[in-house]
Structure formats: structure tokens, C-alpha cells
């Protein structure tokens, strides 16, 4: 029975999410809250931590793979490799630290550079620590305006209260799924066009 279960899990669709943002904005806290329903305030940064979880997305069982990358400059050189493997990105900043919001533009540029061959990259801008409203440095209008300029969704979250934590991960998975479906459609369209052409060519040769 266990073998069957393992097999079915192995055949589930896998969506790869990368957490991106400056150090201390709460990327790990958001990830751990989503994974384990726990709020972890102090978390030692590493190069990257990977998590995998089975979830139900719009009635379909899927797996989400979350790579939580460190925001520190020391790790900038290895970030490119992580970005290449990602299918969607949560670009996180803290609403209490304007500098972390400013840094999102640079992180986005890095993602676009690494994924230059792709048309539309699934990405959400996330303003974390919404529970600390009294310490807000980034106005909602400013963050929303930047997200609109980039053509992406802006959501405010709190890893502490769990506000919108599920929303950002599930919304991003929906974007990843839509992109995959669109790519498969294009691929199948090209394939059928190719086979029609080769059939035509064969007919001509005969």
C-alpha cells in the first residue's frame, strides 16, 4: 500500500516556487507558516532551504516545492542557479523597511535576466509584516503602483497572523499552472502542425 502511495505522490504535478527578497523581510517565516502552521521569528539564514508539500489546488492534488533563498549579498553569485530552476517567484519585502521594497526592483531584474528566454514569468510582489501597520514605511499605493507597472499582483501578508499566507502561494501556483498549460498547448499545436506538414511532404513525394 505504501508503495502505491509513493507512486501516486511521485506522479503528482510539481510546481516550483522560489522565495526572493532582502534578508530579514520574513521569507522563511512565510514559508514555515505555510508549511507547518508555525510562526518562527528568528531564523538563521542559509544559502537556501528547500521544502515540499502536497496540497489541493482547485480540487486537484499537486505538490509545491519551495526554495527559500537567502537575501544576503554574500549569496548573490549562487542565486542565478536557483532562479533558473524556479517556475514562479514570490518577491518579498517588509512594509516596515522601505529599503527592502526598493531592492525588489534589482531582484526582479536578476530574475528577468536569468529567465530571459521565457515570455511571462509567474511572479507576485508580497508586502510582508502587515501586522506591524504602525511601523509601515511603504504606502500601499506605492507598492501597488510598482506591481501594476510590472504587470503583476500585489498582496500584503503577515507570517505572524497568517494573513494571506495561503493566498500568495496558491495564487502563484495558479499562475504557474496557467503558464504550463499555455506552453503545452503551444507545443502540441506546433507538433500537430509539423506532423501535418510531414504528411503533406510524404504525399507529394509519392
Swiss-Prot record:
Residues 181-206 are annotated as: Disordered. Its EC number is 3.6.5.2. One of its GO terms (biological process) is positive regulation of epidermal growth factor receptor signaling pathway. A lipid is attached at residue 203 (S-geranylgeranyl cysteine). It is a lipid-anchor. Residues 204-206 form a propeptide. Belongs to the small GTPase superfamily. Ras family. This is Ras-related protein Ral-B. It comes from Rattus norvegicus. The lineage of its organism: Eukaryota, Metazoa, Chordata, Craniata, Vertebrata. The gene is Ralb.
